[in-house]
Each structure stands twice: as C-alpha cells, then as structure tokens.
Amino acid sequence: MRNQTFIIVGAGQAGAMAAATLRQQQFDGDIILIGKEYHAPYERPILSKDYLINPEEAPKYLFSEDFYLEKQIDLRIGQLVSQIMPSKHCVVLENGGKLRYDKLLLTMGARARRFPLLDQLGENIYTLRTLDDAQRLRQAVKKDKRILIVGGGVIGLELAATSCELGANVTVIEQADNIMGRCAPPLLQDYLLNRHQEKGVQFFLDTNIVSAQKQGSELVLILNTGEKVIGDIIIYGIGAEFRDQLAADAGLVTDGGIVIDSRCQTSEPDIFAAGDVCLQREPLTGDLQRRETWENANRQATIAAHAMMGLAPPQPGAPWFWTDQWGINIQMVGNMQAEEWHIQGDLQSDKAILFGTENEVLVGAVAINQGREMRNLRKLLANPAQVVSGVEWA
C-alpha cells in the first residue's frame, strides 16, 4: 500500500504545528507544507512588541531548518496554491504544477483589513500581519514621529504602546465607544484606556474618519466630530479579512471564513482547516465562533492533525490568549462577555484578577501580572465549577 500524502496549505503557526503534530503522532506518510511567504514558519506575537522595539531582535522561527529535514516535512516557501480540486484530490500551484493529496489541511490565515479612504494617501500606510510588515514598520516608527493608529483592538493597542516606547507621538482612532470591545470586559477596557492615556496616547473613541488628504509629507484626517488629526504615518488595526476564497472556489462551505466542525473538518470529508481562516461550529449551540489567537491556532492544528489520522482529538480547554502592553502582562481565559465581573487585588498596582460569573458560575477570568495564577484558572475553567458561596471578592 502506498504512503499517504497530507498537504498543508499555509505555513504559519497552525500549518507548522499541524505538521509537527502529525510526526509526533507517528504519521509516516508524506507531508508537504506550502507557504506563500518567503520565510520559514515564525512566531507572530513578538512582531508588535519586542521585534519592533529592539533593532537587534531576530525573527523567532517555530522550528530550525534541521527540524524539517529530520522530520521529513517537505517545506515549500514562496509558493502559492491557486486551486483546489476536491473531486480529484489535488491542488494546483500558481506555476501550474499539481500535487495529489489524501488529506488536505487549509491554514491560510488572514490578511489585514484595509481602509480604501486612507489607502489613497500613498506609501506611509502600514499594516501588521507578517514579518515583512514588521520589517517595514521597524524602519518607520521612530522618535517624535506622529503615528495615527486606526483601530483600538489588541494589535492597535500593542502598537500604540510599542510606538510610544520608541518615542513616537501616538493617536488612536476607534469607531466603537470602547477599546478591545470584542475581547475584553468593561473593567479591563477602562483599566487599559487609563494606562495608555497616562503614558500620553491620545484617543478618539466613538469616532469615524470622514475624509483624508495628504498635505506635503503630512497625512490629514478629518473626523466626524469636525476635529482634524495630523500624522506622519498611519497604521491599520481594524481587524482581518480571512483567506477563504480558495476554499469557496472549491465549493467548501464558507461564511466569512471556512466553516469547520469540532474535528476541524470542512464540508469536504478529506479537507480540514485550522487557525485564523476558520469559523468553528460550537457543538452545544451550533453557533459559529472565530478565535484569532495564537493558542487557538495551536489547538486547532493539534485537533486537525489527529482527525486527519483518524485519531481521537485531545479535549479542548477554555479559550485563552494574552497581550503585553506597557510591560503589563494580561492573560484572558474563558468567556469575556460574562454578566458580572469581580476584582481580586488592586488594579492601580497593576496586579489583579478579574473573575467573570454567570448565575454564580465562574465562566471567565483575566489575570493582570498574575501568570502563575492563570495556570490554575485555565485548569478550573476547563471544567467550569459552581463558585463557592461566601467568597469575598477583594
């Protein structure tokens, strides 16, 4: 019987981790890992932080070159898959070559969402999704530069903190009336907003950009409030567009992302997907959920690798992610939309835990500079328990 061939399209966090997991689980067939970028798989979280701050900081690759050789993973960087042919179990490369697969894993991730109104201003418009993006930003963000960040989500705020630390003057423009609205409870939103403002970041919340123009080297934005903001460069932090067109063209079910089940299987039995490109259907509610985090990419990669081999996947834990801003480590686990939040510790001292509850049940937690406690919280929230009555929330 011939060896099976598993092809992975997308050589980011999820793709590389899936390939590694397949070998860890003793898959002895061929693994082909295809990546569009001209870089081996690398860690992305540092791109908005250490990599920008320290000019000597080198990219952090997920695995060494020797790893791919030793594990017999055929890593093909700088290649693009242009078509999937599910009925023939093959993918077509941009150069016209065809590769046959037994199982296919799609991990193409996402691209930064852009703002056409601002794109017309020229070359001083930046995004941050890739190592190449980070290298461009490294050259642009300098002392006394006026940085306009469009979007007050995690990436926008991390870039605001990093840019300030480099001596830039930073303004954040956010359409919503809060920051990190999709992923943080109100207590954390207010805390982070205060910290950024104390460091000199200017915020325009509940604000839209209605016009933009370039005057010499200056970028001038007019807001719906009538106010004018001027910058030297603009950085987008307005979310992502998911690279699901390849899947949609192949007839897979998509809905603003590739729809997968709890085993990371798509609507085609031999095609799986993992990471930022996915929408996963929750078994209990049937709702489609997207989680664009490092942890989720690793978790889904592991689940997909097991499923491709016909193995029982590991039990998923509660969703977890982190952000570092102003030297403050913030970790979040579970449901950030809980009905009630309780504080243990002192936010003013940058050391506290926020507990989210619904009907007296612990459903989420935020640890601020409390990394050790987060380990216990993650274990606890893997199997949610009734909060003990009588607990005093300090």
Swiss-Prot record:
Catalytically driven reaction(s): 2 reduced [2Fe-2S]-[ferredoxin] + NAD(+) + H(+) = 2 oxidized [2Fe-2S]-[ferredoxin] + NADH
NAD keyword on record: yes
Pathway terms, separated by semicolons: Aromatic compound metabolism; 3-phenylpropanoate degradation
EC id: 1.18.1.3
GO CC annotation terms, alphabetical: cytoplasm
Transmembrane segments: none
Record-listed NAD(+) binding positions: 146-174
Keywords for the protein's UniProt record, in alphabetical order: Aromatic hydrocarbons catabolism, FAD, Flavoprotein, NAD, Oxidoreductase
Gene3D superfamilies: 3.30.390.30, FAD/NAD(P)-binding domain
UniProt key word Phosphoprotein: no
Required cofactor(s): FAD
GO molecular function: 3-phenylpropionate dioxygenase activity; ferredoxin-NAD+ reductase activity; oxidoreductase activity, acting on NAD(P)H
Binding of FAD, residues: 5-36
InterPro entries documented for this protein: FAD-oxidoreductase/Apoptosis, FAD/NAD-bd_sf, FAD/NAD-binding_dom, FAD/NAD-linked_Rdtase_dimer_sf, HcaD, Reductase_C, Ring-hydroxylating_dioxygenase
Oligomeric and partner information: This dioxygenase system consists of four proteins: the two subunits of the hydroxylase component (HcaE and HcaF), a ferredoxin (HcaC) and a ferredoxin reductase (HcaD).
Biological role: Part of the multicomponent 3-phenylpropionate dioxygenase, that converts 3-phenylpropionic acid (PP) and cinnamic acid (CI) into 3-phenylpropionate-dihydrodiol (PP-dihydrodiol) and cinnamic acid-dihydrodiol (CI-dihydrodiol), respectively.
Protein's UniProt name: 3-phenylpropionate/cinnamic acid dioxygenase ferredoxin--NAD(+) reductase component
Provenance organism: Photorhabdus laumondii subsp. laumondii (strain DSM 15139 / CIP 105565 / TT01)
